[in-house]
Amino acid sequence: MTQDYIVKALAFDGDIRAYAAVTTNAVQEAQTRHYTWPTASAALGRTMTATAMMGAMLKGDQKLTVTVDGHGPIGRIVADADAKGDIRGYVTNPQTHFPLNDQGKLDVRRAVGTDGTLTVVKDVGLKDYFSGSSPIVSGELGDDFTYYYATSEQVPSSVGLGVLVNPDNSIKAAGGFIIQVMPNAKEETIDKVEKAIGNMTPVSKLIDQGLSPEELLTEILGKENVKFLETVPVKFECNCSHEKFLNAIKGLGEAEIQAMIDEDHGAEAECHFCRAKYQYSEAELKGLIEELNA
């Protein structure tokens, strides 16, 4: 099994900043946990891939959450990532699938919808948050992340995302790239890169052919123009815990907790991101009430 990872690079003497990722295993983990059907797998996988690369732009303990809500049948897509390559995600309606579109591809646009917003919240530490959003312009997601960067962060970018799904619903290939134009970039560089992106083979096909993140960027930017900086391993990782959900239950207040004791003699919580279930005994709930009244 090939390791998922992101590569960071500069190109054309610093005119271009670039990221590329192979995320096949992480998207497979999400597919397995949520039992997503193919169109939902593609939508979730594309969102997770973009989010992972955006996470790789962060530093230290910073993290970010991306929410895509196009008011389509799939509902909301939520993914979050950190600077260390940990990624997780879920969709409201994982069992969403449609016939292939006119191009013979998974109809992600129909599932996502085109009437809504893409929102990014960055947790940059010390309880400091940056939030930006942009309208969904395509529903195919690559174009929507491209538009987000142009309008919300004022960084001209090209975002390519792809997921191929096998007939048995497993993930055949997943990955993508983010190419960003730095301030004062030369016009001829921008023209070259735009042309290369316009002519390239779909990213999911390149990953399926076995191309690494480095080879993806070489394909777009040309071997002689790219300087690779570092790689970040990517994995599906959820940081939920018994303790975190216990604190969340505590936040519901005494009346709500008492109702759980009276009606169910305990409680169960399920994590949206990884589907882990946590059981809480009547004694634990009574302990929370005691803490609230201490």
UniProtKB/Swiss-Prot annotation:
Mind listing the UniProt keywords for this protein, alphabetically? Chaperone, Cytoplasm, Disulfide bond, Redox-active center, Zinc
Kindly list any coiled-coil regions of this protein: none
One Gene Ontology term of the biological-process aspect is:
protein refolding
* Subcellular location(s) per record: Cytoplasm
Q: Tell me which InterPro entries the record gives.
A: Heat_shock_Hsp33, Heat_shock_Hsp33_C, Heat_shock_Hsp33_N
Q: What does this protein do?
A: Redox regulated molecular chaperone. Protects both thermally unfolding and oxidatively damaged proteins from irreversible aggregation. Plays an important role in the bacterial defense system toward oxidative stress.
| Family stated for the protein in its record | Belongs to the HSP33 family.
According to UniProt, the name of this protein is 33 kDa chaperonin
Question: What is the originating organism of this protein?
Answer: Staphylococcus carnosus (strain TM300)
Cite the source lineage. Bacteria, Bacillati, Bacillota, Bacilli, Bacillales
